[in-house]
């Protein structure tokens, strides 16, 4: 009896809790039908547990096309990417994340969240928020991003709109904010920045500083920017 045990290495890897031998369904199929013999993919080998039989296994450990091909032949689950595993443990009740979000459960913390900042004229901050927060709430509700307005670190005439969320959420929210700024700027231009042609009043600080974003090539305001886009637009404070 001991000799038979030593002659079958696969038996040693398949002890059950009662001290006997336990064969997998796949192994029993190969013995009973004789169809194993490297004719089917090994489901254990292509699983997270791995195959304990190694070279003695009766099933294929290599299938052209890899896991996807083996999955189609044996009805295995599709592979779970590492990003999906990270997201499963990062948000929502019970540490699960569905990828769609539950509209009734509020915002979900999402793997890979980041922030983006937009500089705006301080006079536009209140209008961007809107009466009772109507504009900021709409942006947050439609995009899922968080929006907050903070003081500018260096210029008291500016405010910082900070957006927090995923790259896609921030991208959509930024577009909505800039569209809102464009509408507000066109309404305020006759009163806030000058005459009918949009020229600044002598006492304003319009175009008195070089635009940092323009120097870096990422200013999104274009002609609406309050800062100079080059030396040709730069003017001294108090001079029209």
UniProtKB/Swiss-Prot annotation:
Zinc finger (C3H1-type): 36-64, 205-232
InterPro entries, per the entry: KH_dom, KH_dom_type_1, KH_dom_type_1_sf, ZFP36-like, Znf_CCCH, Znf_CCCH_sf
Residue spans of biased composition, Gly residues class: 89-104
UniProt-listed Pfam families: KH_1 (PF00013), zf-CCCH (PF00642)
Keywords: DNA-binding, Metal-binding, Repeat, RNA-binding, Zinc, Zinc-finger
Residue span, KH domain: 113-177
GO biological process: positive regulation of leaf senescence; regulation of DNA-templated transcription; regulation of photoperiodism, flowering
CDD domains attached to this UniProt entry: KH-I_AtC3H36_like
Region of interest (Disordered), residue spans: 1-37, 81-106
Domain of life: Eukaryota
A GO CC annotation given for this chain: nucleus
Molecular function as annotated in GO: DNA binding; DNA-binding transcription factor activity; mRNA binding; RNA binding; zinc ion binding
Keyword Phosphoprotein in record: no
Protein name: Zinc finger CCCH domain-containing protein 52
Species per Swiss-Prot/TrEMBL record: Arabidopsis thaliana (Mouse-ear cress)
């Amino acid at each position: 009896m001991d000799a038979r045990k030593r002659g079958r290495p696969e038996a040693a890897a398949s002890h059950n809790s009662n001290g006997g031998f336990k064969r997998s369904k796949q192994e029993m199929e190969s013995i009973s039908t004789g169809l194993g013999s490297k004719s089917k993919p090994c489901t254990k080998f292509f699983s997270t547990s791995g195959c304990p039989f190694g070279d003695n296994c009766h099933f294929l450990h290599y299938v052209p096309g890899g896991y996807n091909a083996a999955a189609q032949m044996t009805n295995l689950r599709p592979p779970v990417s590492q990003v999906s595993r990270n997201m499963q443990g990062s948000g929502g009740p019970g540490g699960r994340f569905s990828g769609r979000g539950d509209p009734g459960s509020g915002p979900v913390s999402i793997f890979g969240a980041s922030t983006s900042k937009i500089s705006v004229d301080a006079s536009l901050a209140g209008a961007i928020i809107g009466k009772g927060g109507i504009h900021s709430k709409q942006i947050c509700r439609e995009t899922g991003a968080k929006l907050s307005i903070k003081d500018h670190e260096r210029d008291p005439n500016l405010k910082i709109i900070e957006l927090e969320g995923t790259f896609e959420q921030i991208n959509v929210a930024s577009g909505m904010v800039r569209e809102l700024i464009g509408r507000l700027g066109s309404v305020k231009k006759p009163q806030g920045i000058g005459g009918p042609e949009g020229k600044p009043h002598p006492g304003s600080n319009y175009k008195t500083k070089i635009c940092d974003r323009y120097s870096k090539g990422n200013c999104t305001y274009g002609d609406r920017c309050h800062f100079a886009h080059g030396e040709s637009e730069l003017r001294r404070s108090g001079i029209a």
